[in-house]
Structures are given as structure tokens and as C-alpha cells.
Amino acid sequence: MAKDGVIEVEGQVVEALPNAMFRVELENKHIVLATISGKMRKNYIRILPQDRVVLEMSPYDLNRGRITYRYK
């Protein structure tokens, strides 16, 4: 359920950083800085390096994103 104007892409977590930030490598080898969405944080969904995730990115800043789903 993405918002209008939001870009959804898939990637793989490369590195876990402090303050629930992650470096994610997209399928096109671009690396972005991502945070966890509020619903994932509320439900205590853990994200580790090598996890496949779905990101929402704003068209205005393509270097940051929000992790909205973790594949099992």
C-alpha cells in the first residue's frame, strides 16, 4: 500500500548502523541509507545483514529510503 509518488524497490541489507539505520544495496548496485518503518518498529521485526527487503524511496531524495517489508 504505497503512497502516491513513492518509488518501491527491492534490495539487500549490507550493513547495520547505529540508531536503526541500514545500508541497503539495490538490484542496480546503488547503495542507499534506510530506516525501519514505524509498523515494523512497533512489531519488533528484526533486520539483519543479508536480509532481502522492500524499500520506499521519495523521488526527491534517492539516497535515503524506508524499509517497509522483510522477506522471510
From Swiss-Prot:
Any GO CC annotation of this UniProt entry: cytosol
Cytoplasm is among the record's keywords: yes
Major site of localization recorded for this protein: cytoplasm
Gene3D superfamilies: Nucleic acid-binding proteins (2.40.50.140)
Domain S1-like: 1-72
Signal peptide: none
Location of this chain's protein in the cell: Cytoplasm
Keywords, alphabetical: Cytoplasm, Initiation factor, Protein biosynthesis, RNA-binding, rRNA-binding
A Pfam family of this chain: eIF-1a
Molecular-function annotations in GO: ribosome binding; rRNA binding; translation initiation factor activity
Subunit structure and binding partners: Component of the 30S ribosomal translation pre-initiation complex which assembles on the 30S ribosome in the order IF-2 and IF-3, IF-1 and N-formylmethionyl-tRNA(fMet); mRNA recruitment can occur at any time during PIC assembly.
Family assignment from sequence similarity: Belongs to the IF-1 family.
Record function comment: One of the essential components for the initiation of protein synthesis. Stabilizes the binding of IF-2 and IF-3 on the 30S subunit to which N-formylmethionyl-tRNA(fMet) subsequently binds. Helps modulate mRNA selection, yielding the 30S pre-initiation complex (PIC). Upon addition of the 50S ribosomal subunit IF-1, IF-2 and IF-3 are released leaving the mature 70S translation initiation complex.
Name listed for the protein in its UniProt record: Translation initiation factor IF-1
Organism: Bifidobacterium adolescentis (strain ATCC 15703 / DSM 20083 / NCTC 11814 / E194a)
